[in-house]
A protein has these predicted regions:
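Domain-scale recognition of functional cores that engage charged ligands
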Residues: 1-171
Length: 171
């Protein structure tokens, strides 16, 4: 992991020393958790593991998501919230329906720095379809997720300076 290690002075100084695997904070680096939060099969586990107010807040902050899985759904089933029977239908969504984000997950050279992130409505339909089908084909080797798209926004937040002072900034 740490594909950008050369830009981190402390890690660069250790180059060739210890071998570190998995990454330093795997629980923060794997996007799969973003989709698993919404898995109906895990609902009770999340409710038992997390305080109610914390789970509620996480669900407010984390856009709804799905683990990309090529396994066919039973005839009577549908993907939650988008109510389609297959990823092929999602691949054929119109630009308006493609308010979705496709993301590679796990520990891969394209899983950081937005290298493996594709915004559905920002790309032509054929390219969206190709990316989605490619991710489905690769899903047995590398996990992928799809999330609802949400517009970013600027907020005011504290920045803690080395001298102990706190400055409010927009970001």
């Amino acid at each position: 992991e740490l594909f950008d290690w050369q830009s981190i002075p402390a890690v660069k100084a250790l180059a060739g020393s210890p071998r570190i695997t998995p990454p330093f904070k795997p629980h923060l680096e794997d996007k799969l958790w973003l989709a698993l939060l919404w898995s109906p099969a895990l609902k009770k586990i999340w409710e038992q593991t997390l305080r109610g107010s914390h789970l509620k807040r996480l669900r407010e902050l984390v856009p709804f998501g799905w683990v990309l899985d090529p396994t066919p759904l039973p005839p009577h089933a549908a993907l939650p919230k988008i109510n389609v029977h297959s990823w092929d239908e999602v691949a054929d969504f119109s630009q308006k329906e493609r308010q979705l984000v496709l993301k590679i997950s796990g520990f891969h050279e394209t899983a950081w720095g937005s290298r493996g992130v594709f915004i559905g409505h920002d790309m032509p339909g054929p390219e969206w379809s190709e990316r989605l089908h490619s991710a489905l084909d690769l899903s047995s080797e590398q996990p992928w997720i799809v999330q609802e798209f949400r517009e970013g926004r600027r907020i005011e937040h504290p920045v803690f300076r080395d001298d102990g002072s706190v400055e409010m900034m927009q970001g």
